[in-house]
């Protein structure tokens, strides 16, 4: 059976760190920022690390070979 391919959309959205954690951009920034608090906007600026349960699902389904 051939190797499972990495999903192209996942390559653009997720980055795997050296320790195996998965970094993603913070959600909720596409529109409607005018009514958000300054703290929300500031916190959503950077990236975040997925929890272990979500990271396991992402690796299993979308990034079988890593990046």
UniProtKB/Swiss-Prot annotation:
One cellular-component annotation, GO: cytosolic large ribosomal subunit
Give one GO molecular function term. structural constituent of ribosome
Q: Does the keyword Membrane apply?
A: no
Report whether Ribosomal protein shows up as a keyword of the record: yes
- Some GO term, biological process aspect, for this entry: which one? translation
State the coiled-coil residue ranges. none
**SUPFAM superfamilies xrefs:** L35p-like
Keywords assigned? Ribonucleoprotein, Ribosomal protein
Q: Which InterPro entries match?
A: Ribosomal_bL35 (IPR001706), Ribosomal_bL35-like (IPR021137), Ribosomal_bL35_CS (IPR018265), Ribosomal_bL35_sf (IPR037229)
Q: Domain of life, per the record?
A: Bacteria
Which protein family is it in? Belongs to the bacterial ribosomal protein bL35 family.
Q: Cross-referenced PANTHER family, in alphabetical order?
A: 54S RIBOSOMAL PROTEIN BL35M (PTHR33343), LARGE RIBOSOMAL SUBUNIT PROTEIN BL35M (PTHR33343:SF1)
The record's annotation in NCBIfam families points to:
rpmI_bact
Would you tell me the protein name for this molecule?
Large ribosomal subunit protein bL35
- Annotated organism of origin: Bartonella tribocorum (strain CIP 105476 / IBS 506)
